[in-house]
Amino acid sequence: MVIIRLARGGSKKRPFYNIVATDSRNRRDGRFIERVGFYNPVATKGEALRIAQDRLTYWQGVGAQLSPTVERLVKQAQKAQPAA
């Protein structure tokens, strides 16, 4: 099953997450099919969250499931989208 979830990057104490479409059997930071966006929780300036909505809807259309955290981030991005 394909799942859209976070893959951790960055250094110690400075997390950075890629939002990726991957097979659910792969490791958290292992091989992925496509990078759909990113989330930077420690960003002070610039953008902390970017999601390619067209690719996200494509993957959901072919049956990919969102992890609970990615669901929350997608709602957050959609809420911020009309304000921008």
From Swiss-Prot:
Q: Which GO terms describe its molecular function?
A: structural constituent of ribosome
Q: Name one GO cellular component term.
A: small ribosomal subunit
Q: Which Pfam families match?
A: Ribosomal_S16 (PF00886)
Q: Which InterPro entries match?
A: Ribosomal_bS16, Ribosomal_bS16_dom_sf
What Gene3D superfamilies has UniProt attached to this entry? 3.30.1320.10
Gene Ontology terms describing biological process: translation
Q: Which UniProt keywords apply?
A: Ribonucleoprotein, Ribosomal protein
User: Which NCBIfam families does this chain map to?
Assistant: S16
Database matches in HAMAP family: Ribosomal_bS16
Query: Which PANTHER family does this one have?
Result: 30S RIBOSOMAL PROTEIN S16, SMALL RIBOSOMAL SUBUNIT PROTEIN BS16M
Q: Which family does it belong to?
A: Belongs to the bacterial ribosomal protein bS16 family.
Write the protein's name.
Small ribosomal subunit protein bS16
* Organism, scientific name: Burkholderia mallei (strain ATCC 23344)
